[in-house]
């Protein structure tokens, strides 16, 4: 399990850093009452240290105001981690594996920030699925931006409009997809 957690920590950190992008200079401005809520989703398939990773960004916004942001990462486990878990009952290990992963990857520090919820699950298919559910209306941007590895994403959200944030994801290769249910 320690090997698995170390592998996951490195892989997730690399995946998060690849999305840090370039922060824009525009500050978020309160949206007009006429602005309608829009939800857009984008997906980026990439290799991180030779392993397949899918990152899905879903942003709900009205004008220049974020309403909800979800970043979902599905990462293939390294073969040695898959072997270590083979034949084990993942449902009984889920809590322990999730807790260890969160600690080793720094995700546990994000969970302490107001406005962020993180869910981690290791699947039977040999992937780790991480969901970052962000409530921008309650997010402590300053605290989030200080979390190692993940801070640049929150600096980017703070300094960019939702459309600029989405554009930076597209610039990295993100393609629009239908919104997840």
Feature locations, PLM:
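Bacterial N-terminal signal peptides that target proteins for export
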Residues: 1-2
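Bacterial signal peptide processing site
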Residues: 15-17
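C-terminal motif of bacterial Sec signal peptides marking the signal peptidase cleavage site
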Residues: 10-13
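Subset-of-secretome marker
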Residues: 31-181
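N-terminal low-complexity, Pro/Thr-rich disordered segments
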Residues: 20-34
């Amino acid at each position: 399990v320690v090997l698995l957690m170390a592998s996951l920590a490195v892989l997730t950190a690399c995946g998060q850093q690849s999305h840090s992008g370039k922060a824009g200079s525009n500050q978020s401005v309160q949206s007009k009452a006429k602005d309608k809520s829009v939800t857009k989703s984008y997906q980026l398939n990439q290799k991180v240290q030779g392993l397949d990773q899918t990152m899905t960004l879903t942003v709900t916004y009205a004008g220049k105001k974020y309403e909800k942001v979800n970043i979902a990462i599905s990462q293939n486990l390294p073969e040695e981690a898959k072997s270590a878990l083979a034949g084990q009952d993942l449902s009984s290990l889920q809590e322990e594996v999730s807790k260890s992963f969160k600690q080793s990857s720094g995700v546990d520090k994000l969970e302490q920030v107001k406005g962020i919820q993180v869910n981690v699950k290791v699947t039977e298919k040999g992937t780790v699925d991480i969901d970052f559910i962000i409530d921008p209306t309650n997010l402590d941007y300053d605290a989030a931006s200080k979390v190692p590895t993940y801070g640049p994403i929150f600096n980017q959200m703070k300094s960019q409009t939702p459309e600029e944030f989405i554009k930076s994801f597209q610039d990295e290769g993100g393609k629009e997809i239908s919104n997840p249910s």
